[in-house]
Structure formats: C-alpha cells, structure tokens
Amino acid sequence: MSDRLCLLTVHAHPDDEASKGAGTIARYHAEGVHTVLVTATGGEEGEILNPALDTDEVRANIAAIRRRELDDAAAVIGYDEVVLLGYRDSGMADSPANADPRCFARAPLAEAVGRLVAEIRRARPQVVVTYPDEQRGYRHPDHLRVHEISVAAFEAAGDPAAYPFAGVAHQPQKLYFTVWSIEQIVARHEKFVELGITSPYAEWFADGWPNRMGGLAPTARIDVSEYYEARRGGLLAHATQIDPSSPFWFGLPEDVDRQLYSAEAYVCARNLVGPIGAEDDLFAGIRENVAAPGG
C-alpha cells in the first residue's frame, strides 16, 4: 500500500502548467495530494507577449526570467515540486530553433524517456497527466514530444528491465490527457457575443475550427469552481508570456469568467484499476489503496 496520493504532470514549457489543469492541481493540493510538475524545456524561444516587458534586458535574460516565473506560478497553483528535464525550447515548427542540437525535439527519444522514467520512479505517482497526440490546434514540436515521452515513460516506469539506471521500478495506475473542452470554448465564445465584446475566438469559428477539433471526448471533468484564483494567479505569474489585458485570457468580466471556468476536462488514456468511464476524480479506484492523503 502506498502511503500517499501523488499526481505528476508533464508539460512542455513554463506557463503550460498555468493554462492547462491549474485548477485541478490547486484542488488536489488543497486535499493533501503530493503534486509534482515536470517541465521539459526552459521556454527560451517564447515570445514576449506582454508589451510592458518587451525590453532588451528582458530578452537577454529570458531563460532565467522564465524559470523564476515558473517557480512563482507553481507556488501559486499549488505544486509541491518543480522539476526541469533540462532541454532547450525547440521553437515553433520549421523555425531556426529546431536545428539546435540542445532542443527537446532533437533529443534522442530513449534519452528523454529515461529522464522522465527517473522522475516517475522517484516521485512514485499513481496518476500522470500529459498531452494527447491529437493537437490539431497547436502542433508545437515540444508538445508532441511531451506526448511521446509521457506515454512511453508510463509504460516503462514499471518494468524493472527498462532503464535500470533510473531507479526502482514503479507503475503509475492511470494516465490522463489534459484537453480543452470544445463545449467550454463554444460557451466562452457565445458569452463574448452575448455581451457585445469582440471574441478572441471569432476567427477560429469563422474558419470552421470546431469541426476540425473532434476526436477526443473528455472522460473526466474535475470541479475546479473553488480554484479560479489559482489559475488566474498562475497565468499572471508568467508576466512575460501573459498580457494582463489579453482578451483571450481576461476578456470577460471576472464574475462571468469564473462561472464559465468551473471544470477542467481530461481523457483517460490508461486505467490499470478499472474500466475507462465517466469520472469526476482522477484518483477514482485508487484512493482506497492509499493509507492517507499527504501521509
């Protein structure tokens, strides 16, 4: 019997942990679950999206600044640990950064999987959260590679013969993909229209985006209605990446935004404790085999 619940998430860049699943982490952290953030890269290729910080000094020190932002955001959200796998940001597809031998997308797959296996075996989570391979809206090389290494590491971590240098074998019980619910995005777009505010999603809908995004229907919806501030604060901690006046993140009145941000959606990709079905708890089927949350 394990002596604590542990949730490990795998993200590509600093700020991804704030935009994907922050409310879920805040909720489980508040319940006493041990929460671990693994970030693959330092986000060195990220554009400075906050005009107030777009200076020569910030650009020259972007790697160090983004690491500080990551630590600040993780503290606001409720991560107990932050681990960097140590790769360089690969940049967008077909950008010059793709050619850098230090970048994540160019790392040998077995090497990157081994690094993640080591973290899984060290932290010993029951639940791992990562990205799906179906990323039609944002096919960043690092996001696709995160999916690859996460699935492979989930399978390998419990095999003593795989990566024997990476610690004592440990098999997580469930693997989830974090997804943006199309229904929630539609609801947000419609609320912008209803309130007479220009919708940042208008172009998406104009070119048929919802019809191209089908395929992954959420199997789990986690109630995060009490953790709106954690997500908002986590986003704002990434000051170089998040413009506080951004209509995408903050275009709706806060009370309206809070109502629309009531749940976060996931797809269960592996479940070793039972059949995959509708859930409202990522630890469903696991809790009874753990001595005590946070124990």
Locate each region found by the language model.
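Metal-dependent de-N-acetylase/amidase catalytic core
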Residues: 1-10, 97-98, 102-295
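Active-site rim/loop-helix segments in enzyme catalytic domains that contact anionic ligands
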Residues: 1-124, 255, 267-268, 275-276, ...
